[in-house]
């Protein structure tokens, strides 16, 4: 009796599976993923992990070096500052105002930028031209300078600094999304979809948005890195979070005069800012490469 040999058809992996395989095989992307996950945990639970209070002072233990130093104490792993406060506790608690604040600012700028940029990219004529010239004018001003101007009028505080950074990031985000949407709408597949009777909303949601995801991830990564640096810079200039806040930029500015006496009080907050920006960029680049591989 003859037997029919039936072979199951091998299905190619889907877009998400292909993107995840590409992301998982990228070592730098996984480092960024785990690092950003650690930053998220610190933003939420950093105050609970801190062994001491952020304002708790220990008399007689001022300017102790880190514990691995010859004159360090095990009780103060990263040493103390000029007021006898534990540096590790302040760094752990400072992740929320620096990285957490930057994440909130970036999320708000992304949402507003998506709405305004998509609307601007889908329109033509006078409205698009006016918005384009306004964005070009705002982009001519550096983001940090614009944030300093806003804080100078509003007053120094963390909330005002976050608003100023959001206001500085918004034109760049709107301009980038506007350019991506405008370029996609000029392509042939969009024209074909319009000829088939697809509405503008369907074209934007089902055709344009999936094709600008990689560029959008790049812009979000850049915006988050800029937000971390700008919030820290405003704190360093005493225009953002005010002491005794453990915000990393404020810690860096407060300890600047101790750089020759106690260099760890300057190097540790600066290293925290640098590592945070590096991890965000590693994650963003990995996600962008994975999305491109999945789409292709």
From Swiss-Prot:
One example GO MF annotation: putrescine transmembrane transporter activity
Sequence intervals crossing the membrane: 29-49, 99-119, 134-154, 197-217, 223-243, 258-278
Keywords recorded for this protein, A-Z: Cell inner membrane, Cell membrane, Membrane, Transmembrane, Transmembrane helix, Transport
Cellular component annotations (GO), alphabetically ordered: ATP-binding cassette (ABC) transporter complex, substrate-binding subunit-containing; membrane; plasma membrane
Native source organism of the sequence: Escherichia coli (strain K12)
Cellular compartments annotated: Cell inner membrane
UniProt similarity note: Belongs to the binding-protein-dependent transport system permease family. OppBC subfamily.
Function: Part of a putrescine export transport system, does not play a role in resistance to antimicrobial peptides.
Matches recorded under InterPro entries: BP-dependent_transpt_permease, MetI-like, MetI-like_sf, OppC_N
Membrane topology: Multi-pass membrane protein
BP terms from Gene Ontology: peptide transport; putrescine transport
Traits of the deletion mutant: Single mutation, decreased extracellular putrescine, in an sapBCDF operon deletion no change in resistance to antimicrobial peptide LL-37.
Domain named ABC transmembrane type-1: residues: 99-284
Signal peptide annotation: none
Record topological domains on the Cytoplasmic side: 1-28, 120-133, 218-222, 279-296
Coiled-coil regions listed: none
Gene3D superfamilies reported for this sequence: MetI-like
Protein name: Putrescine export system permease protein SapC
């Amino acid at each position: 009796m003859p037997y029919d040999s039936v072979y199951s058809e091998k299905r190619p992996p889907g877009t998400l599976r292909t993107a995840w395989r590409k992301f998982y095989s990228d070592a730098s992307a996984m480092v960024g993923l785990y690092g950003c996950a650690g930053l998220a945990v610190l933003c939420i639970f950093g105050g609970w992990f801190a062994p001491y209070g952020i304002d708790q002072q220990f008399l007689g233990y001022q300017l102790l070096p880190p514990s691995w130093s010859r004159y360090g104490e095990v009780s103060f792993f990263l040493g103390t500052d000029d007021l006898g406060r534990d540096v590790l506790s302040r760094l752990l608690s400072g992740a929320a105002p620096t990285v957490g604040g930057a994440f909130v600012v970036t999320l708000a700028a992304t949402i507003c930028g998506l709405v305004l940029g998509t609307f601007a990219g889908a329109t033509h004529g006078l409205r698009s031209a006016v918005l384009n010239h306004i964005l070009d004018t705002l982009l001519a001003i550096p983001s940090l300078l614009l944030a300093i101007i806003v804080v100078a009028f509003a007053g120094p505080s963390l909330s005002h600094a976050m608003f100023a950074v959001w206001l500085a990031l918004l034109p760049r985000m709107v301009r980038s999304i506007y350019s991506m949407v405008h370029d996609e709408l000029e392509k042939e597949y969009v024209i074909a979809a319009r000829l088939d009777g697809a509405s503008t909303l369907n074209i934007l949601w089902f055709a344009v948005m999936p094709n600008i995801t990689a560029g959008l991830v790049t812009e979000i990564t850049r915006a988050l890195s800029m937000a971390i640096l700008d919030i820290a810079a405003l704190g360093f200039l005493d225009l953002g979070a005010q002491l005794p806040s453990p915000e990393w930029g404020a810690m860096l500015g407060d300890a600047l005069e101790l750089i020759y006496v106690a260099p760890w009080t300057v190097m540790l907050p600066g290293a925290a800012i640098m590592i945070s920006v590096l991890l965000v960029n590693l994650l963003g680049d990995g996600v962008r490469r994975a999305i491109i591989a999945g789409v292709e």
